[in-house]
Amino acid sequence: MDTPRVLLSAVFLISFLWDLPGFQQASISSSSSSAELGSTKGMRSRKEGKMQRAPRDSDAGREGQEPQPRPQDEPRAQQPRAQEPPGRGPRVVPHEYMLSIYRTYSIAEKLGINASFFQSSKSANTITSFVDRGLDDLSHTPLRRQKYLFDVSMLSDKEELVGAELRLFRQAPSAPWGPPAGPLHVQLFPCLSPLLLDARTLDPQGAPPAGWEVFDVWQGLRHQPWKQLCLELRAAWGELDAGEAEARARGPQQPPPPDLRSLGFGRRVRPPQERALLVVFTRSQRKNLFAEMREQLGSAEAAGPGAGAEGSWPPPSGAPDARPWLPSPGRRRRRTAFASRHGKRHGKKSRLRCSKKPLHVNFKELGWDDWIIAPLEYEAYHCEGVCDFPLRSHLEPTNHAIIQTLMNSMDPGSTPPSCCVPTKLTPISILYIDAGNNVVYKQYEDMVVESCGCR
């Protein structure tokens, strides 16, 4: 083989290799390692079609490092996340009493017993708990009066108030109460009001064990605007209706008033599960889950100008794409059980007769676990199938459905078939956090399909 032909072949080979990706980068030599590193990074940036910058969240997650914010940018930790919606604050820990209500009524629903038949529910379908926001008055020793403050602004005047109770955990006394001077009473009043709401008589001779004291405060909540509720606990010796003037007139032999702290009602050194709890029982009209989502949107808008920012949850209600029932943008999207079956409704299976089919609902996949405490998932079922002639009696067709099915059997092109829809629905209990960070139990109607029919 002569030399010109060899040179020509080498030129064609080099031209071919030069067009291959990465050959130029590999063939460029550098006199120093720093120049080579910079050239490599520059080539990678040009290939990606962007300038060098801090890694994205997804890239940082793969590298196991948190992305470092630039000085001119707001720190990422201060931006709202999907798991912590704007305006909600830290995660709310439900009180054990509310969890017990949910467990009790959920079991009753499985047994076919409506929660409104329970005496403790007071025929209510909504039970809201409010945590005490007051502080001990340390300037008074002994503590003869103690105020409890509750923000009840989330209650609606459209709801019927059927009951309210104040639950106070009385710790075991650390010291004897002293010589008895008659019966020992703890009384509950509205702040700045002489109206006695409820009272309890304690035995000064014995040492009562720790436990909950429940006071009926329905009258106090019924006669005031639903914004702030202030209740005052007092302790006194003697008869239940004895006033302060009568107690002072008894002379120096009257023992000092009992200290509420020594009675076990002090707030200091108290875990969250032992804090005072206001429980309100209401009966509201039929309310669906989308109404709750609108309240979540309203609370986010009220949180501040950044509450409705792009990528936050919930989105602003005025936005054209505001669909709060969809998963939040920051969440990992998954195919739900319903979505995975959506493509199987054609062909042979679509000709099955109308019947109840499984539909597993996962609130976490919907992005609702930010405000729903329990249940995080349940079996809702759905109706699927055809309503063809002749209609089966167990489908309980209406007269209109029968006529429509007959017309469809004679001329399918002119009349559509009747639809397979739920004919009986049952409720489920949901424990959730409202827009005011209060834990609420509510019985939602029409959540589970019990039977299907043609309509």
From Swiss-Prot:
SMART domains linked: TGFB
Q: Where is this region: Disordered?
A: 29-93, 244-267, 300-351
Biological processes annotated in GO: activin receptor signaling pathway; apoptotic process; BMP signaling pathway; cell migration involved in metanephros development; epithelial cell migration; fat cell differentiation; metanephros development; positive regulation of chondrocyte differentiation
Q: Does the keyword Zinc-finger apply?
A: no
* GO MF, one example: growth factor activity
Composition bias (Low complexity) maps to: 77-91
Outcome of mutating A249E: In KFS1, MCOP4 and LCA17; reduced protein expression associated with decrease in growth factor activity
Q: Mark out the compositionally biased spans (Basic and acidic residues).
A: 45-76
Which cysteines link up through disulfide bonds? C354-C420, C383-C452, C387-C454
Q: Where is the composition biased (Basic residues)?
A: 330-351
Top-rank taxon: Eukaryota
Listed under subunit, the entry gives: Homodimer; disulfide-linked.
Q: Which family does it belong to?
A: Belongs to the TGF-beta family.
Q: Which disease is it linked to?
A: Klippel-Feil syndrome 1, autosomal dominant: A skeletal disorder characterized by congenital fusion of cervical vertebrae. It is due to a failure in the normal segmentation of vertebrae during the early weeks of fetal development. The clinical triad consists of short neck, low posterior hairline, and limited neck movement. Deafness is a feature in some cases and may be of sensorineural, conductive, or mixed type.
Q: What does this protein do?
A: Growth factor that controls proliferation and cellular differentiation in the retina and bone formation. Plays a key role in regulating apoptosis during retinal development. Establishes dorsal-ventral positional information in the retina and controls the formation of the retinotectal map. Required for normal formation of bones and joints in the limbs, skull, digits and axial skeleton. Plays a key role in establishing boundaries between skeletal elements during development. Regulation of GDF6 expression seems to be a mechanism for evolving species-specific changes in skeletal structures.
Q: Any idea what this protein is called?
A: Growth/differentiation factor 6
Instruction: Please name the gene that encodes this protein.
Output: GDF6
